[in-house]
């Protein structure tokens, strides 16, 4: 598979494609909710695996499940972890709406979900899936996090600020 390589601070390589790449929001999310060295972690809507790989680059060595719906994106992460011998990150080609592996066992779940519920979509299917709620909604992400997290676990999302406002009840 044709890809470009981005190198993180401590030399971990992230494989990207024209459709599956990452932005600063994913790096900020990874740093915001960074798991402790041996904690169990899940990277939902993992794309090319930037959150999981950033955690690894910064010292996380606990089990990490990276759940991604799109085969090309999941394959990029699979290739990156295989070629670099990163055994604690397990890419899962799966729909988070039905993902159940490790239920109730995770300390940290992170997700940089699709941001847009409506509006014009890219003609490229992969880009549309990554940016628009075509295959999962914010509610789906929260439900998956709830299933996977242990008591006291943390779910961290990077989302549009306008969705944080809820009008007061009358």
Question: Which residues does each predicted region cover?
Answer:
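Conserved small/polar residues in nucleotide/adenosyl-binding loops
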Residues: 165-170
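Class I SAM-dependent transferase core
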Residues: 1-36
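A short glycine-rich, Lys/Arg-flanked "PGG" loop and its adjoining helix->strand segment in the class I
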Residues: 138-151
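Mobile active-site "lid"/loop adjacent to the S-adenosyl-L-methionine
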Residues: 113-140
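Conserved beta-strand signature within the Rossmann-like core of class I S-adenosyl-L-methionine
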Residues: 153-158
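Conserved SAM/SAH cofactor-binding pocket of Class I
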Residues: 31-103, 108-111, 117-122
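Short "lid" loop at the C-terminus of a central beta-strand within the Rossmann-like core
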Residues: 115-116, 160-164
